[in-house]
A protein has these predicted regions:
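Bulky hydrophobic/aromatic "packing anchor" residues in well-ordered structure
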Residues: 71, 76-78, 106, 116, ...
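A short glycine-rich, aromatic-capped structural motif
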Residues: 62-127, 137-144, 229
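Disulfide-stabilized, aromatic/cysteine-rich ligand-recognition loop
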Residues: 2-51, 55, 219-220, 254-302
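Extracellular structured ligand-interaction cores
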Residues: 66-68, 73, 101-103, 158, ...
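Functional-site microenvironments in short loops/helix caps that host divalent-cation chemistry
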Residues: 132, 143-278
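Short glycine/proline-rich turn/loop motifs
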Residues: 96, 126-133, 276-281
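Membrane-interface motif at the C-terminal end of an N-terminal transmembrane signal
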Residues: 51-65
Length: 302
């Protein structure tokens, strides 16, 4: 208020002086117009900045705030997934020792229909079909869709979100992980083929798995929900090819193909990265998953 009064008095004094000097009146009006214009634009830019900040806060407040569970750090036994051969015959990879670092947290639940819709509504994620209500897991997403969602969530939260590596998913799954290795000692390839056929038939018994609301398939010993339920979950692990030594104890990975990624669930499946429904095609290796979804891990930065 005092500032406005002082400015008014100043302008009145200036105007009185200008009346006595008409030749300077035009210069005064030009200067006054410039000052008013500058103040107007300053006000407009300040208002725009406030609106931008409010919009960012709104997006962050409506973004997913997932419950998290810490993946136990430490050393554990892990069997790599891929196409491996010994003496040119298909075989399973041996167990390897892997280490999980500290500070990695995984979503307690898969990304839901509501969570994914927030990204779509923000104009960042691809529109995909959804089944059921907001508290159902989002399905019908490709690996590429999941990566875009992780990038969006990282951007709006300022945190690092990504798909889990397969060994991280296995560690988090605990007793819910299904090791689909074919334990057979015979060197006859037909024996392995028959064993794989029986395993596939057992995995395909019954109808399509039922989609349930979040938590509908229960929790594992770590408190993580819906692992190995109806939804197969994308990992960032690429398709691997390799050979085993004659004794079968050492694995040499010869190549990786990252146009195909590993999905984990009731069994392992390698799926082409742009596929959203593997039931109609696109499963590169293994039985096709019933539904494709995902959950993310958050990497802490110390």
């Amino acid at each position: 208020m005092m500032r406005c009064t002082r400015d008014g008095v100043r302008y009145l004094k200036i105007f009185k002086l200008l009346k006595e000097r008409p030749q300077q009146l035009e210069v005064f009006w030009v200067a006054l117009l410039k000052e008013v214009t500058l103040r107007f634009y300053a006000f407009m830019f300040t208002g725009l900045a406030i609106l931008i900040v409010l919009y960012i806060l709104y997006v962050q407040s409506t973004a997913a705030r997932p419950d998290l569970v810490t993946i136990p750090a430490g050393v554990f036994q892990y069997r790599p997934a891929g196409d491996f051969r010994r003496d040119k015959r298909v075989t399973d990879a041996p167990y390897q020792e892997r280490r999980i670092a500290t500070g990695i947290e995984i979503m307690k639940y898969p990304v839901s229909v509501k969570d994914y819709a927030a990204c779509v509504n923000d104009g960042s994620c691809n529109q995909v079909a959804s089944e059921g209500s907001n508290n159902m897991p989002q399905t019908g997403v490709s690996y590429l869709d999941a990566v875009i969602y992780a990038e969006w969530l990282s951007e709006i939260t300022g945190q690092t979100w990504r798909l889990p590596k397969d060994e991280e998913w296995v560690r988090a799954a605990g007793e819910r992980f299904h090791d689909d290795a074919i334990s057979i000692s015979s060197d006859d390839p037909s024996d392995r083929w028959l064993a794989e056929y029986k395993a596939n038939m057992a995995n395909r018994e019954g109808t399509l798995a039922e989609l349930r609301v979040l938590g509908g398939y229960g929790h594992n010993s770590l408190g993580i929900a819906d692992l190995s339920g109806a939804v197969w979950e994308w990992t960032q692990t690429c398709m691997k090819n390799g050979t085993l030594t004659a004794n079968g104890f050492t694995l040499h990975v010869s190549s990786e193909y990252c146009g195909v990624r590993l999905a984990e669930g009731r069994h392992r499946a390698f799926v082409i990265d742009f596929v959203r429904d593997a039931k109609v095609g696109g499963c590169a290796v293994g039985l096709p998953p019933d539904y494709l979804g995902f959950r993310l891990v958050r990497q802490k930065i110390f």
